[in-house]
A protein has these predicted regions:
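Helix-start/capping segments and mature chain N-termini
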Residues: 1-75, 92, 98-287
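Ordered, amphipathic secondary-structure segments that act as subunit-interaction surfaces
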Residues: 78-91, 98
Length: 287
């Protein structure tokens, strides 16, 4: 595959960064993942805004130009012979001394990765998937709020735990906070419906302020749905009428069963997709 590094296209085996890049040494870097539709990156402005704000917090001098990024993505689609793709835009701090940083990073590295979108499993959107409760808690944010940073060990350990549950193949893993509140999935934000109100964990839990999470809330409110964020527990999920998860690539995925770490299974909405989730999926398709 071809990728973009600092505005230039390279074959993936030719694109390298220094061993003194603080993204490699200390995990000082941020990234955004999103997809294209008809060759156009979806919600690019929102992703770049989050990326820019995070870079400011980390002292990384990076202010992306949306038109330039969109053009690079278009070139990558063309050279890789893809109509649409999964995109990862990464910004690492750049080269500095071996030691804890303190100053401004003025020469960050920008890397745009691209790969084919996973095949769309229509059965998931018509029948739903499972959500597995994990023992591993969600770690606390690195700063005042959670960055989409290179620090991904918590998610990787969660993925390893999920793979140990033989009954939950294909499921998403759900993490709680240390205090036992609902947090988020390994690669998704969580929603549930109770009494026709769409609920989602508050950002006060330390979850990622997901771009698709925000978009779905706006989409729901614009179409007359009631929404609410707050501090919720596992029992709230068990008593919910519907559950769904969201991310930028999978969009809105309905959940029709829950599993505990000891393998106990609970059906959601009698094992079928609820009307609100189904309606939001259709609305998302048409935007």
């Amino acid at each position: 595959m071809w990728i973009s590094m600092n505005g230039q296209l390279y074959k993936e085996e030719q694109a390298v960064v220094s061993v003194y890049d603080h993204g490699f040494l200390y995990g000082l870097g941020l990234f955004e993942t999103f997809r294209t539709y008809a060759g156009k990156p979806f919600l690019l402005q929102e992703h770049l805004l989050r990326l820019t704000e995070g870079c400011k917090e980390l002292g990384i001098a990076y202010e992306p130009n949306m038109e330039r990024i969109a053009e690079q993505i278009s070139k990558l689609l063309e050279v890789n012979e893809l109509q649409d793709a999964y995109i990862r835009l990464s910004v690492s701090a750049g080269v500095d001394i071996l030691g804890l940083p303190g100053g401004l990073y003025e020469q960050p590295n920008e890397i745009i990765y691209i790969k084919s979108l996973p095949p769309r499993d229509e059965a998931v959107y018509s029948q739903g998937k499972a959500l597995q409760l994990l023992k591993l808690p969600r770690n606390t944010p690195e700063g005042l709020y959670r960055f989409k940073s290179f620090h991904y060990m918590n998610n990787i350990l969660a993925k390893r735990e999920l793979q140990n549950y033989r009954w939950s193949a294909g499921a998403e893993g759900l993490m709680l906070t240390e205090e036992g509140y609902l947090a988020e999935g390994i690669v998704s934000n969580l929603f549930f419906v109770k009494n026709d109100v769409i609920c989602t964990p508050s950002l006060d839990t330390g979850i990622l302020p997901g771009i698709t999470r925000s978009y779905v809330l706006q989409l729901a409110e614009a179409n007359g749905f009631s929404t609410q964020d707050g501090l919720y527990r596992w029992e709230d999920l068990l008593q919910s009428d519907e559950i769904f998860i969201v991310n930028s690539v999978q969009e809105i995925v309905p959940i029709t069963s829950l599993y505990t770490p000891d393998g106990q299974k609970y059906l959601v909405s009698h094992g079928s997709i609820g009307p609100i989730a189904r309606g939001l999926i259709e609305l998302y398709k048409t935007t």
